[in-house]
């Protein structure tokens, strides 16, 4: 239950010596025989938790970006272990001295290898809609809400690479980067 998970996380946090902790947790449907169906009803879920000392991303550090065609399957909104395209894109970015790789399908920007990407143009916060082409990030969700709460117009429609290049600001967001501004592309 939510209460049990909360209790477990607080118990683990109490064992950490740092005041700022990065927490990552996953719940699976449980352990079962290798097959393509879900485990039998009543199978106990597995919980995996990773914690380490860590601070929010440094928003004063501006990222260099690169891009590549998004060839991932059509269910990017589902968190899976099928991350090879993301890993290869992150490696490409790293080898080019970039902090992230922007995925696009044709000319339409989707997201980054392990972050969401949004733009600001003429005072409007624009971000890809939460459809099957992106993993809807928690930080992205909070950014949208903060903009709405502060009267900043939000446009959740697809945008193009040309719009990205012409943006007043490009924001890369994730749980680890928080909100990192981008300064350079390719």
PLM feature segments, named:
Residues 3-15, 28, 33-186:
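Helix-start/capping segments and mature chain N-termini
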Residues 22-27:
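ATP-grasp fold ATP-binding core
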């Amino acid at each position: 239950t939510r209460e049990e998970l909360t209790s477990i996380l607080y118990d683990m946090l109490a064992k950490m010596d740092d005041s700022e902790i990065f927490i990552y947790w996953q719940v699976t449907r449980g352990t079962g025989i290798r097959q393509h169906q879900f485990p039998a009803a009543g199978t106990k879920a597995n919980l995996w938790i990773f914690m380490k000392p860590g601070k929010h991303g440094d928003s004063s550090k501006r990222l260099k970006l690169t891009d590549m065609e998004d060839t991932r399957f059509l269910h990017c909104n589902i968190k899976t272990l099928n991350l090879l395209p993301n890993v290869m894109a992150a490696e490409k970015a790293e080898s080019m001295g970039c902090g992230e790789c922007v995925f696009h399908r044709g000319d339409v920007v989707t997201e980054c290898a392990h972050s969401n990407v949004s733009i600001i143009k003429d005072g409007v916060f624009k971000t890809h809609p939460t459809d099957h082409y992106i993993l809807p990030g928690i930080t992205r969700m909070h950014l949208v809400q903060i903009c709405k709460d502060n009267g900043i117009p939000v446009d959740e429609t697809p945008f193009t690479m040309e719009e990205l290049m012409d943006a007043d600001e490009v924001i890369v967001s994730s749980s680890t980067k928080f909100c990192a501004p981008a300064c350079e592309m390719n």
